């Protein structure tokens, strides 16, 4: 996995629950200050423009579980595409299979979704898919393997849904499957930060 640092410290440093797991929201409620600044800190220190851009980049990179190299390559690809670079980045990140599983409500976090994909829980158009970073396409059909243990986990996760489901997905909770009705658009996505800051960061 690209992100190996302590997730609790990352969440506290960035000041937002980027991983989706409710336990990190509770952690921020108890310890809102960044690590190492727990005592006597009333508010977060002001940062430079560069520092703010870097912080926003880290929000997205950690949220989607990407290495710096993967993230830079994604920016380069988005920049080559037609349209607005920031919007293209959002769409490409949302199209990752691990994120799609998360948006389906089948996992409570992208971290869990990544593990489920790696353990071969899912099929795309009838073929086993085990690469978290692979991108889904319009009209793809994502199904789960017919195993009782897998279905039990997913049905439990569906009861814990945090309202993160993607509007571009048609989810069948009975069959535990989903169809990609269209590619995700920027207006359909609730980003974890300011995507324009990332464009500015890499355009320096």
Curated annotation (Swiss-Prot):
Pfam families in the record: Ribosomal_S4, S4
Question: Record keywords: Transferase included?
Answer: no
Q: Which InterPro entries match?
A: Ribosomal_uS4 (IPR022801), Ribosomal_uS4_bac-type (IPR005709), Ribosomal_uS4_CS (IPR018079), Ribosomal_uS4_N (IPR001912), S4_RNA-bd (IPR002942), S4_RNA-bd_sf (IPR036986)
The record describes the protein's role as: One of the primary rRNA binding proteins, it binds directly to 16S rRNA where it nucleates assembly of the body of the 30S subunit.
- The residue ranges of the S4 RNA-binding domain are 95-157
Q: What protein name is recorded for this chain?
A: Small ribosomal subunit protein uS4
Checking SUPFAM superfamilies in the record gives: Alpha-L RNA-binding motif
Query: Which organism's genome codes for this protein?
Result: Treponema pallidum (strain Nichols)
Q: Which GO terms describe its cellular component?
A: small ribosomal subunit
GO BP term (any one) = translation
Which SMART domains does the UniProt record give? Ribosomal_S4, S4
């Amino acid at each position: 996995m690209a992100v190996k640092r302590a997730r609790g410290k990352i969440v506290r440093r960035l000041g937002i629950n980027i991983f989706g797991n409710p336990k990190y929201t509770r952690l921020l409620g108890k310890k809102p200050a960044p690590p190492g600044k727990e005592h006597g800190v009333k508010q977060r220190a002001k940062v430079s423009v560069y520092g703010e851009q870097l912080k926003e980049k880290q929000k997205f990179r950690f949220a989607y579980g990407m290495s710096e190299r993967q993230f830079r390559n994604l920016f380069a690809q988005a920049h080559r595409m037609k349209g607005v670079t920031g919007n293209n980045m959002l769409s490409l990140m949302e199209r990752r299979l691990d994120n799609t599983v998360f948006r389906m409500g089948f996992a409570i976090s992208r971290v869990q979704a990544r593990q489920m994909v790696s353990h071969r829980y899912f099929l795309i158009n009838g073929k086993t898919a085990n690469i978290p970073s692979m991108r889904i396409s319009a009209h793809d059909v994502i199904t789960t393997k017919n195993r009782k243990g897998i279905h039990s986990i997913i049905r439990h996760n569906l009861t814990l849904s945090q309202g993160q489901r993607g509007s571009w997905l048609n989810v069948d909770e009975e069959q535990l499957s989903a169809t990609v009705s269209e590619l995700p658009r920027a207006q359909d996505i609730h980003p974890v930060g300011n995507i324009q800051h990332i464009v500015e960061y890499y355009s320096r």
